[in-house]
């Protein structure tokens, strides 16, 4: 299933060879290169118009060649585009197709969200500290 904006996050508290990957997990099932792919084998994968997107964070261990889900919470659905980032201990996000952006705290509790009207989707929303 689809994802958007994967970020590598190194953490000095982790053992050597470990790091985090976090992403806006669109959770949209489409494979244009394999049009006959059977997405029914993957329960809860969204279609273009509806589904559930997620903030997903994985702990990667290169020494053992494994990964595990470290944190996940649902976001407003968007089959395409969208973004998440880590900033100041919080998680700003944008969900392009739902025309929503906002911020969650580190535990996945919504702080504030905004909706906008537009003919097109926002590709990304980034927050900066000046």
Residue ranges and their predicted role:
Residues 1-130:
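Histidine-/acidic-rich catalytic cores in large beta-rich domains
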């Amino acid at each position: 299933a689809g994802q958007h904006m994967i970020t590598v996050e190194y953490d000095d508290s982790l053992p050597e060879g470990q790091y985090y990957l976090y992403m806006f997990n669109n959770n949209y099932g489409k494979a244009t290169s394999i049009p006959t792919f059977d997405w029914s084998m993957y329960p809860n994968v969204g279609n273009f118009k509806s589904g559930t997107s997620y903030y997903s964070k994985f702990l990667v261990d290169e020494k053992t060649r494994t990964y595990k889900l470290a944190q996940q919470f649902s976001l407003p659905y968007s089959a395409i585009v969208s973004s998440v980032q880590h900033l100041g201990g919080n998680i700003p996000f944008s969900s392009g197709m739902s025309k929503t952006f906002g911020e969650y705290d580190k535990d996945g509790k919504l702080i504030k969200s905004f909706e906008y009207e537009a003919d097109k989707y926002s590709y990304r929303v980034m927050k900066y500290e000046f």
